[in-house]
C-alpha cells in the first residue's frame, strides 16, 4: 500500500465511489469520510476496521455490491492510506493536521462547508463509548457536534456571520484536543456479551467489513 497523503485525483475517485454507492444511510462524501476516520483515530477504545468500514455505509445491510474486486480493493487501499496519513499527522505532526472540509462556490465566493466533516466525526464517535470524557473537554466535542447533529441546525442558522466563523475555526483545535486526551487516557473495551453461534459469521461467510472475502481469509482479521 502506498503511503502519504492522497492526491486530488485519488480523493475525487473516493468521492465518486461514495456517490455511486450512496444510500440514505451512508456517508455522503470524502469530507464525511475524513471526519469519521479522525474520530476513529481519536477513539477512547480501539475500533476494528470491520466496524468503521461497515459504518461508512450505515450498516451491514448497506455495504455495496462492488462492481469488481479491483474497485473494492482500490477503495480499501485509498481509505487505509488516507487513514494512515491522518494518523501520522495527529500523532506526530499535529500542526499539519487539517480537517478535509468541503468547499462550495456561492455568488463567485468560495465557502468552507464543515457540516459533512462534523457529521462524519459524530458517526465515528457513536462507534465507541465517550461517556468518560471529562467536563473540561465536553466543549470541544460540542464544538464539533454543533455542526454535526441535526438538532443543532436551527441554532447554526441563527448565528451571526462572525459567530459562525468562530465556530468553524474552533473545530480543528477541538479535534486535536480530543485526540490528545484519548491517546493519553485510553479506555478498555467493555466486556461484550457472548455472541450466539448462529449470529457469528462463519469462517466461510462473507466478512461483514464489505471486503467481499471470506471471513477466515479477510486481510482485516
Curated annotation (Swiss-Prot):
Top-level lineage group: Bacteria
InterPro entries per the UniProt record, alphabetical: SEC_C_motif (IPR004027), YgfB-like (IPR011978), YgfB-like_sf (IPR036255)
Any one GO molecular-function label of the UniProt entry: iron ion binding
NCBIfam families according to UniProt: PRK10396.1, ygfB_yecA
PANTHER family reported for this sequence: METAL-BINDING PROTEIN, UPF0225 PROTEIN SCO1677
Name this polypeptide is given: Uncharacterized protein YecA
Origin species: Escherichia coli (strain K12)
Amino acid at each position: 500500500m502506498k503511503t502519504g497523503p492522497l492526491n486530488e485525483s485519488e480523493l475525487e475517485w473516493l468521492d465518486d465511489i461514495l456517490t455511486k454507492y450512496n444510500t440514505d444511510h451512508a456517508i455522503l462524501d470524502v469530507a464525511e469520510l475524513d471526519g469519521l476516520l479522525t474520530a476513529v483515530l481519536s477513539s477512547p477504545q480501539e475500533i476494528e476496521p470491520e466496524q468503521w468500514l461497515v459504518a461508512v455505509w450505515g450498516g451491514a445491510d448497506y455495504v455495496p455490491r462492488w462492481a469488481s474486486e479491483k474497485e473494492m480493493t482500490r477503495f480499501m487501499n485509498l481509505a487505509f492510506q488516507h487513514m494512515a496519513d491522518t494518523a501520522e499527522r495527529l500523532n506526530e505532526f499535529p500542526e499539519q493536521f487539517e480537517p478535509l472540509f468541503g468547499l462550495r462556490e456561492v455568488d463567485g465566493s468560495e465557502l468552507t462547508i464543515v457540516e459533512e466533516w462534523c457529521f462524519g466525526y459524530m458517526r465515528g464517535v457513536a462507534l465507541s463509548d465517550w461517556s468518560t470524557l471529562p467536563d473540561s473537554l465536553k466543549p470541544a466535542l460540542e464544538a464539533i457536534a454543533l455542526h454535526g447533529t441535526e438538532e443543532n441546525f436551527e441554532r447554526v442558522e441563527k448565528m451571526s456571520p462572525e459567530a459562525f466563523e468562530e465556530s468553524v475555526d474552533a473545530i480543528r483545535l477541538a479535534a486535536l484536543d480530543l485526540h490528545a486526551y484519548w491517546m493519553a487516557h485510553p479506555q478498555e473495551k467493555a466486556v461484550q456479551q457472548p455472541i450466539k453461534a448462529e449470529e457469528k459469521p462463519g469462517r466461510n461467510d462473507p466478512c461483514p467489513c464489505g471486503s467481499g472475502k471470506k471471513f477466515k481469509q479477510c486481510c482485516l482479521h
